[in-house]
From Swiss-Prot:
Gene Ontology CC: core mediator complex; mediator complex; nucleus
MF annotations from Gene Ontology: transcription coactivator activity; transcription coregulator activity
Lineage of the species this protein comes from: Eukaryota, Fungi, Dikarya, Ascomycota, Taphrinomycotina
Keywords: Activator, Nucleus, Phosphoprotein, Transcription, Transcription regulation
Recorded superkingdom: Eukaryota
Family: Belongs to the Mediator complex subunit 4 family.
Localization in the cell: Nucleus
Assembly with partners or alone: Component of the Mediator complex.
One Pfam family of this chain: Med4
Physiological role: Component of the Mediator complex, a coactivator involved in the regulated transcription of nearly all RNA polymerase II-dependent genes. Mediator functions as a bridge to convey information from gene-specific regulatory proteins to the basal RNA polymerase II transcription machinery. Mediator is recruited to promoters by direct interactions with regulatory proteins and serves as a scaffold for the assembly of a functional preinitiation complex with RNA polymerase II and the general transcription factors.
UniProt biased composition (Basic and acidic residues): 188-198
Annotated stretches, region: Disordered: 168-221
Gene Ontology annotations of biological process type: positive regulation of transcription initiation by RNA polymerase II; regulation of transcription by RNA polymerase II
The protein's name in its UniProt record: Mediator of RNA polymerase II transcription subunit 4
Amino acid sequence: MEYQRAIDSIEECLNKQLRLSSEKVDQYVLIENWTSLVGHLKTLHSLISNYTNGRELQNEISSLLKQDKELDLQIQDCMREMTSIYDTHLPKTVSGRKRQKVNAETLLDYGRKLSKFSSAPPGYNPETGQDAKAPVHYPWPSEDQMRKTLLFQFSTSMVPNLSATASQLFSEQPPKTNEPTETETEIDANKAVEEKTKMNYPASPTFTTQEENKEVESPANKDVFAGFDLFDPEMEEDF
């Protein structure tokens, strides 16, 4: 559009110049026509120069696009090669790898974090199994617990046979009477002896020696565990 407009303007100025030349006009009119013609020629020249620059830029763009395509092809080739290297040189599975051994100290530290206690319980001796100063917990109930049970009450109110069982003790319970029995009288006598000797019995009978047990032994202290096969730590020490 701009080229056509510039060319039309130039043709119009030339036709006007021919017409003015045939006519007798003032020279200022001719100079003005020539000035406009020169301006249109400059415009056409600038358009032509711009067109030339555009062609050069287009050629450069074409060359750059060509280089871009070539670089894309090179990148694709490099990616294919990298993929092939990954498939051939790196292991496909991790099952064949050697597993690293864990140190024992690491396992112990981890176990201390998970466990309730980080060390052995107080009073524990690996050689004897229990410290001499620590309280001993036997698998049978203590004397205080036995005094509060029905088994002790039945044993103090009647004299069972050596082969009597717990069910027989419950079934052979005599009827209760308001009069004190012989066993209750013996228990009162036993309490009087304990007050005189001022001895405090511990929670477990194993803490008292045999001599002390002999001093306070009375007819009321019957063998409650008669007929029962229980573990005795004193017999274990003899062996």
